[in-house]
């Protein structure tokens, strides 16, 4: 059984000053308000209501921490961090501004953050806000893993095309930065339970959990492609 199945609620944070003073690794989950983020977290942890999925998109405006630890352990081995969903226009302006700053500051400055999982709807990935999230996080040099959620809504051919397209987008980001950063992507469906083990392996590896296994072939890293200038020999 995955140690992720033993995740439990730890705390809710509304200001950076309230972040837990711990040294263990954290894996954060981000995504648009309707990308199925909370549902995916629940499925990965094999729990129904670990992460609260509001019927009102954009309602969750805090950072929620879930500890990962064996049943009899005294201290967490790591944390899953559920970030506020972004991109919902009907959130009041002041509240929206607050949690956008909270989210941005957290992913850019939190030293304990080991990696970022970004949920994107497989039917329309890499929206402007999704790209902004990637661009916010890239300078940290830490890995990004994209879950193309709701893959069950696509035919097999369309799902394969969506995956190939996403890999090309990530390869473009890889070409823009110095050094190698792990940028991976996979198909995921909470309803059909597709891609769960692959995602669990990635998260467990980032948290350095004992169960960590080699990545699945589906989570193929983006390959660095030459920039247009390089291709022209300039």
Swiss-Prot record:
One matching Pfam family: MMR_HSR1
Chain ranges of the EngB-type G domain: 23-209
Annotated signal sequence range: none
Alphabetically ordered keywords of this record: Cell cycle, Cell division, GTP-binding, Magnesium, Metal-binding, Nucleotide-binding, Septation
Any GO BP annotation: division septum assembly
One GO location term (cellular component): cytosol
Region named Disordered: 210-234
Database matches in InterPro entries: G_ENGB_dom, GTP-bd, GTP-bd_ribosome_bio_YsxC, P-loop_NTPase
Residue sites binding Mg(2+) per the record: 38, 60
Molecular function terms, GO-annotated: GTP binding; metal ion binding
Cofactor: Mg(2+)
Binding site for GTP: 31-38, 58-62, 82-85, 149-152, 187-190
Gene3D superfamilies: P-loop containing nucleotide triphosphate hydrolases
Chain's role: Necessary for normal cell division and for the maintenance of normal septation.
Similarity remark: Belongs to the TRAFAC class TrmE-Era-EngA-EngB-Septin-like GTPase superfamily. EngB GTPase family.
HAMAP family, per database record: GTPase_EngB
Protein name as catalogued: Probable GTP-binding protein EngB
Gene name, Swiss-Prot/TrEMBL: engB
């Amino acid at each position: 059984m995955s140690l992720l199945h033993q995740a439990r609620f730890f705390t809710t944070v509304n200001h950076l000053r309230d972040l837990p003073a711990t040294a263990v690794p954290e894996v954060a989950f981000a995504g648009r308000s309707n990308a199925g983020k909370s549902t995916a977290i629940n499925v990965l942890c094999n729990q129904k209501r670990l992460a609260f999925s509001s019927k009102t998109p954009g309602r969750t405006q805090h950072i929620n921490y879930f500890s990962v630890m064996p049943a009899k352990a005294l201290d967490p081995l790591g944390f899953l961090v559920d970030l506020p969903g972004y991109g919902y226009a009907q959130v009041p302006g002041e509240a929206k501004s607050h949690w956008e700053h909270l989210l941005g500051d957290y992913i850019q400055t939190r030293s304990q953050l080991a990696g970022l999982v970004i949920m994107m709807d497989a039917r329309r990935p890499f929206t402007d806000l999704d790209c902004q999230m990637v661009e916010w996080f890239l300078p940290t040099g830490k890995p990004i893993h994209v879950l193309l959620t709701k893959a069950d809504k696509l035919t097999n051919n369309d799902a394969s095309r969506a995956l190939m397209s996403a890999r090309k987008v990530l390869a473009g980001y890889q070409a823009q930065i110095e050094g190698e950063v792990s940028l991976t992507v996979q198909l995921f469906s909470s309803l059909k339970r597709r891609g769960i083990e692959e995602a669990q392996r990635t998260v467990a590896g980032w948290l350095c959990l004992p169960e960590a296994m080699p990545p699945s072939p589906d989570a193929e890293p983006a390959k660095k492609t030459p920039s247009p200038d390089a291709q022209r020999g300039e």
